[in-house]
A protein has these predicted regions:
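Acidic metal-coordinating catalytic centers involved in nucleic-acid phosphodiester chemistry
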Residues: 1, 11, 29, 37, ...
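Short terminal alpha-helical segments
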Residues: 1-26
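Short acidic DE-rich linear segments
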Residues: 2-3, 80-88
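Acidic, low-complexity, intrinsically disordered interaction modules
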Residues: 19-76
């Protein structure tokens, strides 16, 4: 991942942890979701076609970008979640 994307996503680590490991998200502003969606598309070359008013679409986006983020930043995870992520 590009450094500026990692830096932006760092502020949303908690949201990505809850999405990836607990399958829920809290309310995230639409402008933030749009930027996270842009980052996902930039990093993967794929579009999730996210509807920002659809809770399952938002969860899918946060899980997808979270998995990308944690692959490169596994050290930011608590130890018990590191094992879960490595074994997933």
């Amino acid at each position: 991942m590009k450094k500026q994307n990692i830096k932006y996503l760092k502020d949303y680590e908690t949201d990505m942890i809850t999405a990836v490991f607990h399958s829920y998200t809290r309310q995230i502003p639409t402008a933030t979701l749009m930027e996270i969606d842009r980052i996902y598309t930039e990093e993967t070359g794929k579009s999730l076609r996210t509807n920002y008013t659809c809770s399952s679409c938002i969860l899918k986006l946060m899980r997808s970008v979270g998995k990308l983020y944690f692959k490169e930043n596994i050290d930011c995870l608590p130890d018990d979640l590191k094992d879960k992520f490595k074994n997933a």
